[in-house]
Amino acid sequence: MSELVVALDFKDAQSAIEMAEKVRGVAPWVKVGLELFCAEGPEIITRFKEMGFKVFVDLKFFDIPNTVKGAVRSATRAGADMLSLHALGGERMAVAAREGRAEGAGGEAGPLLMAITILTSMDEDDIPFPVPNGLGSAVLDLALASSQAGLDGVVCSGLEVEAIKEKCGKDFLALTPGIRPASVSDDQRRVVTPSQAVDRGSNFLVVGRPITGADDPAEAARRIVAEMNS
């Protein structure tokens, strides 16, 4: 069954925790991104874990292998349940991330490692270099390389999930941002609705502003979960 991840893209812990309280019991996951993590540090992960959430730490690691290894080790020890890293970092970086996870987990499974292919805010016009076979082909190549390097899945548009599952296997996880009910797209380009994402095989759906910007965030989250399960 697909799971809802609420993106808590706030500038401070108080705002994020207040929103988390509103969706607690509806969404099993929250996402901590760059702004919140840089403002509050690893302690914010602990706060959400104490509230009963699983935590996706979305820092999009992309550096030399040894640096990524250390970052993943630290994030694992901080309690992250899922981490993101760029597929463009290549096999050595992916292997280093797995090593960091193993060291940080102390014999436990550790967090899921999800590779970023192409950001869902981007389309072909945003890529600053030629993509000869198109954006979809590039996403598939990055997904396959991530699978072969032993990562758990990819962060990808819902438009690409079916092709990725076909190429990498159904056990290769897909986490889909750019989820917009009623086709509200704002600054996301490659978007799908909750039901479309689930139908195409997404394992995790990341939703931010349609929930956090709603007059009643809990009800907005419930509607999305209902659509996911319909």
Swiss-Prot record:
EC number: 4.1.1.23
SUPFAM superfamilies tied to this protein: Ribulose-phoshate binding barrel
Pathway info: Pyrimidine metabolism; UMP biosynthesis via de novo pathway; UMP from orotate: step 2/2
Reactions listed under catalytic activity: orotidine 5'-phosphate + H(+) = UMP + CO2
GO biological processes: 'de novo' pyrimidine nucleobase biosynthetic process; 'de novo' UMP biosynthetic process
One GO CC term on file: cytosol
SMART domains in the record: OMPdecase
Active site residues according to the UniProt entry: K60 (proton donor)
UniProt entry keywords in alphabetical sequence: Decarboxylase, Lyase, Pyrimidine biosynthesis
Gene3D superfamilies in UniProt: Aldolase class I (3.20.20.70)
Family annotation (InterPro entries): Aldolase_TIM (IPR013785), OMPdecase (IPR014732), OMPdecase_AS (IPR018089), OMPdecase_bac (IPR047596), OMPdeCOase_dom (IPR001754), RibuloseP-bd_barrel (IPR011060)
GO molecular function terms attached to this record: orotidine-5'-phosphate decarboxylase activity
UniProt: substrate binding residues: 9, 31, 58-67, 120, 180, 188, 208-209
CDD domains: OMP_decarboxylase_like
UniProt family annotation: Belongs to the OMP decarboxylase family. Type 1 subfamily.
Subunit structure, interactors included: Homodimer.
Function: Catalyzes the decarboxylation of orotidine 5'-monophosphate (OMP) to uridine 5'-monophosphate (UMP).
Protein name, UniProt field: Orotidine 5'-phosphate decarboxylase
